[in-house]
Amino acid sequence: ACKQEREAELSLSSYLYDFGTITPDSIYRDSITLTNVGNAILEIGEIETGCGCTHASVDKYELEPKESCALHFSFNPKGKGLGAKEELIIINANTDSLFYILQVKAIIQ
């Protein structure tokens, strides 16, 4: 009999988030859902952002199989200039993929 491998696997409800057209004088916030679609405990490690203008946090750092949590993120466009901007939020985890990327976009005007 084969022994089934137990692995954690992370799924993001969105891999691209577009704030649309925004102004530079507000902070924009939203969240997506992270789900452990594997069959072992998922451990979320460091959450990295590309610059000080972007922040991200999770409600939980350990997810049982089929369990979900929110990834909250914010973008402060002040001082970023006008036009199309793109920031990355990198989520590290104990999975085969090692990390997952949420791309955050906006047009500042």
Model-assigned labels for residue ranges:
Residues 2-37, 105-109:
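Beta-sheet-dominated interaction scaffolds and their linkers
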Residues 17, 67-73:
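Short strand-edge motifs at loop-to-beta-strand transitions and within beta-strands
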Residues 24-31, 78-88:
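Short, solvent-exposed loop/turn segments enriched in Ser/Thr/Gly
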Residues 30-32, 45, 71-73, 87, ...:
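Hydrophobic residues positioned within well-ordered beta-strands of beta-sheet architectures
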Residues 33-36, 49, 75-77, 91, ...:
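Hydrophobic beta-strand positions in extracellular immunoglobulin-like domains
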Residues 37-40, 79, 95:
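Short, acidic/polar linear motifs in exposed loop/turn regions
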Residues 39-68:
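Surface-exposed binding patches on compact interaction domains or structured appendages
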Residues 81-108:
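Terminal connector regions
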